[in-house]
Amino acid sequence: MVIAAPEPNTEVQPAIGEQRVVIHGVSWEAYLQILDALPQSRSSRLTYDDGVLEITMPLEDHEFSGRLIECFIRALVELMGLRIKTMGSTTINYPQLKKGAEPDNAYYIQNQPLVKGRNVDFAHDPPPDLVVEVDITHTDIQKNRFYATLKVPEFWRFNGKVWRIYQLQDGVYVEVEASPTFPQVPKERLYAFLEQAKEDEIEAVQSLRTWWQK
């Protein structure tokens, strides 16, 4: 029997990474109307979980971490000779589950050949292979359960200090020490990358390449 990893506690973080508005009792139809009414180019991100709508406005710490994690992933994909389709914060809607999300980043890596060169149809295509969420402040959405229901194989969460890696096993997320997508890369490399990138982002990428090529 696989036991799901507990939801990490994000309330203890002193930094303010996001502003959030939570609305309860929102129907799926109302959620879609709100999506349609909002401009395509916006900083806010929506997550809908069966009646609960959370609107997140990322602040600097959030965006900084999210962008650097994306640089980290793309560098690893290139170094390992993999392929990638980046979905960014594309709206991922599953009407049958009454769930929708705009994660910080989502990627097709293992399944990139299935979706390359076209728009993804979530009604027929598999979910992204890897989803990344930066949650520095408390979120009312149980993200682990949420993305496990969407059957996302791998889920990364970063709270501004701690990076957690979850792998889907028997329908629930289990916390693991190494990424199934990048098994050769220890957690320490991301922490070192983020710390170095605070001073210089290009140098952080160069250091990652040097480490890989040793």
Place the predicted regions along the sequence by residue:
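Gly/Pro/Ser/Thr-rich low-complexity, intrinsically disordered segments predominantly at protein N-termini
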Residues: 1-214
